[in-house]
Amino acid sequence: MLFRYLVWLFRFIEVKNVASISLLVIGSIYLTTAISNNISTTISPTTSSNSLTTAISNNTSTTISPTTTSSNYLTSAISTNISDKEEDTPFSTDKTVFDGLSPITLYRAIRSTLNDTMTDILTRPYRPTTVIFHSDTPQPVKNATQGNIIKKTYRQVLTFFIQPNPLFPCFKNHEVFLNLANILNTILCIILIKNV
């Protein structure tokens, strides 16, 4: 039984090899014929290069020089925006801060420790819906529509610290800014929780 199986297997392999070789020969004949028929349709490199040269020569009249109107517009825009440069002292995280602080610098120093969801009332219009995150409450207070009360109190507290005050004659270290930010954050969250 094993001998008959081996004989059948060898015959199958032999037939399979003959069939595969014949298919390979037939395929190579067709491939050779197809290649010989396509010799006349070869692409010469001069044809594409001539078309490219023609396209380049036709486009030479539309070259962009650096002195066109786009650069002039860019120069005028830059010169216009130079006057909008802010002259205040930038806030740094160092232990020492300059004595001459403008109101917007102090405001940004306090705002840097608060959340970005509070509206910048000195530079942008007020958004009536806002979300306040507080360190003591895990859930934010959403859709605070009592915007006028918040804005008024925030401005009053801010002007209290900005104006010359005997309690705070000058701000010289970073811890003062952090304490002020915590005070403002607590006041705002109390107002929100009471009025929402």
Curated annotation (Swiss-Prot):
Keyword Repeat: yes
Sequence repeats: from-to residues: 28-48, 49-70, 71-92
Gene induction: Expressed in the late phase of the viral replicative cycle.
Entry annotated with the keyword Oxidoreductase: no
Keywords (A to Z) from UniProt: Late protein, Repeat
Source organism superkingdom: Viruses
Family membership: Belongs to the asfivirus I196L family.
Protein name listed in UniProt: Late protein I196L
